[in-house]
Amino acid sequence: MTQTACTISKLSLEFPLKTLFKNLKFNLNQQQLSACIGRNGLGKSCILKILYEQNLKDLPYEGEISWNVPHAYLSQFSRLEADTIASALGVEDLYDAFQRIEIGNASFEDFELTENQWHRPALWQQQLKQASLPTDLNFPVAQLSEGQKTKLALCALFLKTDHYLLLDEPSNHLDASSRLWLIDRLKNHPAGAFFVSHDRELLQHVEHIYALNEFGVTHVTCNYEEYIQKNDLQNKALQRNAMQHQRELKQLKLQQHETQMKAQKREQQGHALRKSGSQAKVLLDFKKEQAGQSLATVQTQQQKQLEEKRTQLLQSQQQLEHIKEQQFVFQHRTEKTGEILRVKDFHSKTSQHLPFDLALQAGDKIHLKGKNGIGKSTFLKYLSQTTSQSSHEIFLSVNTLYLDQNLSDLSPELSVLDNLAKFNRDVSSTEWRNQLGQLRIRGQKAELPFHCLSGGERLKVTLLGLNYLTPNIELLLLDEPENHLDIESRALLAQAIQHYTGAVILVSHDAYFVESCGIQSSVQLVE
């Protein structure tokens, strides 16, 4: 029999400016792999934070949460603050004790600490090796790539086999092989897991979908593809129902109009008969009174039917989620021709890849490929810091725009509008608000501190700001730009990249996203 890991009831989160969700009710079961899906800004990450740490001053929620098992949490941002791998795994004291025992410098406390723990070092090594991470527990975390840091943070959680896991976009920054590793580890984690994700591949392997929208949360027992099929069928049925109610309402209004027209015609005929004197006045008055009573009855019935049909139409329309289309394009003001970038035997001291060559013409788009930690982000960062001139390794003749993985161009404590103003002071707050509205960041959200936005909303704001930089940009350097975005917003960004007439170097581990960008050329970095 399936046992409940967590029971959630009447969960609501309301801010002065916005209600994120209200009266959510659902259960999470042990030994099951479940995912929470939904558009950016609905509060998915907030749900994970609340479930993990119920006393949160910045999230004034209401509701009841009851845990039956220990649980652990992976944040969407700030995943690691450790100095070494041992510290990141949470085993630093135990590891140090084993080290002192190995060199013959142990104390009584060291032997006491390691009692019944002798199997642990082998487990640590196995976990790190399977994740393709350095197995030296003294290795500095600062030297790891973002993808490697994500895997290390996940390893720390997978070591807690009795903990139910709450994971916020766990596949962000992971390369293809690392995503397969993640899927395998999630499937084999004994206690179960509940994660937020927009990763189609990862969502295909879940057993339970919790879909969050403006109406609440819906639990469906299936994977993502099956959910999409069921949801599409349901939405089409609701749309047909709403259209049918609309047709019936129109027909009732037409009938009401015809009834009124017939009544007016009869009244005109009665006036004509009265004037002609062909019928007695008493008889005409009697007929008029009867007709008036009959018309009043019919009109009352028709009005009642109209009100009922309006109510049915309103109810059917309210069941449909009203989603305004988003709009975003990359600005491109001039056309460059010829070669804009040439790289010859490039290699940096901190990268693992072999020296490589690269030539890029104006308008070219390429996919920069390679495993986690090989140096893709390092290369993009180096390019972004290279001035438009020749060096011994790089010739660059255009301005570049660089989007890093951590959205470091914006200040967490400043408001959204204040952050955007830093990119271009000539753009008015009204114009910024209009542009934000096209990305579904509306109303008072523009005045919130940047850190109060969801991960996807933060990325949208960053893209918008970068897009309004004053110098004309001819080369976009995009480091996993799809991270944090919901599936619909990923499609919007892919379309913007595809239609951008300048050049693009894209780092991404999402094959579906790369294909949607229309990028067919690639450069593979190898060790």
What are these regions (language model features)?
Residues 205-222, 509, 515-527:
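H-loop (His-switch) and adjacent beta-strand-loop-beta switch element
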Residues 8-11, 19-32, 63, 343-361, ...:
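Conserved beta-strand
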Residues 146-166, 384-386, 456-478, 493:
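GG-anchored amphipathic helix commonly corresponding to the ABC/SMC/Rad50 NBD signature/C-loop
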Residues 24-42, 190-191, 356-371, 502:
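Pre-Walker A (P-loop) beta-loop-beta motif of ABC nucleotide-binding domains
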Residues 167-170, 177, 449, 477-481, ...:
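Walker B catalytic motif
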Residues 2-11, 95-147, 230-349:
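Coupling and communication elements adjacent to P-loop NTPase active sites across diverse families
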Residues 33, 46-111, 362-431, 509, ...:
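ABC ATPase nucleotide-binding domain signature region
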Residues 78-146, 405-474:
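ABC-family P-loop ATPase nucleotide-binding domains
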